[in-house]
Amino acid sequence: KDLINIVEHKTNKLHLNYYDSSYILPQAGSFQAENAVLAIETIKNEFKNITNFQIQDGLDQWFWPGRMQQMAENIFYDVAHNSSGVNILTSDLFDIYNQKPMGLVVMKNDKIRPEIISLFENAFKELIISTIPSKDILSKNDIKSTKSLNNYQFIENLNDALGLLKNKQFDGPKVIFGSHYIAKYVYKFFDFSFDKGNI
């Protein structure tokens, strides 16, 4: 981990140095660097004669759905659902845009903890909370009865919440996050094929 140096981080590019080699991933997210290095080390162990050119050719095909996946200009979807993941996500977006993101969250009903509430308060310019019909997702009643969530705009219908987020005048990053349960809703709204990859 200490040997990884991120050189450049953009919405569609992560440029990293590892030992004396340089690699580029076609997807944002600082956590991708560790995943890439793990893949590189594994492939080098299996194929002793592989070149950096061949490795880069493989990395050019890199696609990880639901991980800082760009859905539209300045709009991302990420399955981050705990304080560690949300902290990395918001830090990465701040690094790229130099401003706090606007967020839309749908949460599992076991994820409301003080650390994540603190991130909601401090790491976002604005936050919208929504829900979907699922026994595992925080429901309207749960949200309304949780005092720490009452400071945020609640929009029960996820499609309406997505529309509001998309159309809101804001020149910084916007991110939908909190669960892989909402992937099919997000993909349908942004007209992405849900079959592009498993989440």
Where on the chain are the PLM-derived regions?
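Short alpha-helical
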Residues: 2, 63, 83-84, 110-112, ...
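Structural motif
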Residues: 1, 79-80, 105-109, 130-133, ...
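Short glycine-/acidic-enriched loop or helix-start segments at secondary-structure transitions
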Residues: 86-87, 114-116, 138-140, 185-188
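Nucleotide phosphate-binding/pyrophosphate-handling subdomain across enzymes
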Residues: 10, 19-126
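Short hydrophobic/aromatic-enriched beta-strand-loop microsegments
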Residues: 101-102, 125-130, 174, 194-199
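Glycine/aspartate-rich loop-and-adjacent alpha/beta segment that forms the canonical ThDP
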Residues: 180-199
